[in-house]
A protein has these predicted regions:
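A short glycine-rich, His/Asp/Glu-containing loop-to-beta-strand
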Residues: 58-60
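A positional/architectural concept
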Residues: 38-41
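Exposed, interaction-prone extracellular/peripheral surfaces
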Residues: 1-33, 49-54, 63, 72-85, ...
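Small-residue-rich anion-binding loops in enzyme active sites
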Residues: 43-45
Length: 294
């Protein structure tokens, strides 16, 4: 089932937000993010000693007159970042009355919009089974985004997803921006290899875990018949009492804590969001506090 989640009014309200990148930026010239490498922009960064073969037009003759030594001016290189967004389209993302799929699309669309507002490239992929489906491919600029936004609303959710198996064989870039994984991470299939792979490629990794209100704080009590949304062959008949609810909460804390710790150890960002959170709360609150947005 596809989710109609985004409207133009919402995108206009988030236009002023800017994404904050932690790692060095490298890529095609044209974007307006400053990397920590040196290049040919007009913004002065530092000096270094002149060596034979250097461009003499970059010599600082004032420094030579003062120190009787040749110094080369270094400038910040402004390069284009490529934001790559991966959306888990497994059946658990749309299970029951959950709004996880809708939230995933809104977060993906907002991050993509903020990126194109900065003239960065954006690609959006759907994780389906063990492969990626490219929804938006390397667009630059707001006009291109507006022309492609309908594709996000047409994403179909269902089936399984294998995050690592899908991402590892794909082209992920190297040191050229942010990689965002949006999922409920409620799967027996591993995601760790994907995070490690992206981090090793010097990408700024940002994992967003979306859970429904019921998953975060289940209110069900008494006899229940539970169905595994990721495996239709698994069902559970339980009597849910106070102790079961307490054990569930402990298990949930373990799962979310494990992802958080795994990301932190790799200098990756991790966000736990409720499907019922307003996107304004997520972007104007949580992501600003985390330093992902400024």
């Amino acid at each position: 089932m596809s989710i109609k989640a985004i409207n133009e009014e919402f995108l206009q309200q988030v236009e002023s937000l800017q994404m904050l990148i932690k790692n060095n930026v490298a890529g095609l010239f044209g974007g307006n993010r400053k990397s920590k490498t040196f290049g040919s922009s007009c913004e002065f960064a530092d000096y270094r000693d002149y060596v034979a073969g250097d461009d003499i037009t970059k010599l600082d003759w004032n420094a030579y007159a003062r120190f009787d030594k040749l110094y080369l001016k270094l400038y910040l290189d402004e390069r284009q970042m490529h934001t790559r967004i991966y959306i888990d389209a497994s059946r658990s993302m749309e299970y029951g009355k959950s709004k996880k799929a809708e939230q995933a699309i809104k977060i993906a669309a907002t991050l993509a919009y903020l990126s194109v507002c900065e003239m960065d490239k954006v690609s959006v992929y759907v994780i389906r089974e063990k492969s990626l489906e490219e929804v938006i491919s390397g667009i630059v600029g707001k006009e291109a985004f507006i022309s492609n936004i309908h594709k996000l609303n047409e994403i179909e959710f269902g089936g399984d997803s294998y995050i690592s198996d899908a991402i590892l064989p794909s082209k992920v870039g190297h040191g050229d921006g942010m990689s965002v994984i949006i999922s409920d991470f409620l799967t027996d299939n591993d995601y760790e290899r994907a995070i490690d792979h992206l981090a090793n490629k010097k990408r700024h990794v940002f994992c967003t875990q979306i859970l429904s209100r019921e998953e975060l704080n289940p209110l069900t009590r008494g006899k229940v018949h539970l169905f595994d949304s990721e495996n239709i062959n698994k069902t559970y008949r339980k009597h849910v009492d106070k102790e079961i609810a307490k054990a569930y909460k402990a298990a949930l804390n373990y799962v979310t804590g494990k992802i958080n710790d795994f990301c932190a150890a790799r200098n990756a960002d991790y966000l736990l969001a409720s499907a019922e959170d307003s996107v304004f709360e997520i972007f104007f609150g949580k992501l600003v506090e985390m330093g992902v947005l400024k």
